Design a protein with these regions (language model features):
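Catalytic Walker B motif of ABC-type/P-loop ATPase nucleotide-binding domains
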Residues: 73-77
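Conserved switch/coupling elements of ABC/ABC-like ATPase nucleotide-binding domains
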Residues: 123, 127-138
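Conserved ABC ATPase signature
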Residues: 48-52, 56
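ABC ATPase nucleotide-binding domains
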Residues: 146-167
Length: 167
């Protein structure tokens, strides 16, 4: 049976159940209602989750993670298959939640320019091993980009943030 958006997000409270048979509390239900409102998903509460757009579904998955009250939020390509506008919205929401909820957020991102917008610290891997660690300003230099990605390009700055323009 397909899950509603409410049910999908409520799954994030499962770890807080007193037992597998106890059911969700009024507190759990209130938390989900509040987070649906915060994430702009309240109007989709009864809708089948799989019918959401890519951006809406990404927000629903993020809401499910946040309603579990984590200390660390681990995101694997949270912008995958999203258009640029929705990708930026999701990352801004992640950044806001990280600050407001005092979370540590670890995200796998393959878009250097999106990472530049959102990440305080970046780890660059080569062969599955950390090769470089630092801010976008420290890492987005021609030598490192060529070493890690085999990429030649220009680094431009906008609002004091570096962006990569491949050649």
């Amino acid at each position: 049976m397909p899950l509603s958006v409410f049910e999908l997000v409520l799954m994030g409270r499962y770890a807080h159940l007193k037992s597998s048979f106890s059911g969700y509390s009024q507190h759990d239900i209130a938390m989900v209602d509040e987070i649906l409102q915060t994430f702009g998903l309240a109007k989709f509460k009864e809708r089948v989750a799989s019918s959401l757009s890519g951006g809406e579904f990404a927000r629903a998955l993020l809401a499910r993670a946040v309603v579990s009250e984590p200390k660390v939020l681990i995101l694997d390509e949270p912008t995958s298959a999203l258009d640029l506008s929705h990708a930026i919205d999701v990352l801004k929401l992640c950044s806001k939640l990280t600050r407001e909820l005092n979370l540590v957020t670890i995200a796998v991102l393959h878009d250097l320019n999106l990472a530049s917008l959102i990440c305080d610290e970046i780890l660059m891997l080569k062969g599955g091993v950390i090769a470089h660690k630092g801010s976008a300003k420290e890492l987005y230099v021609p030598e490192i980009l060529e070493e890690i990605y085999g990429l030649r390009g220009d680094i431009i700055y906008k609002n004091d943030m570096p962006f990569v323009l491949p050649k």
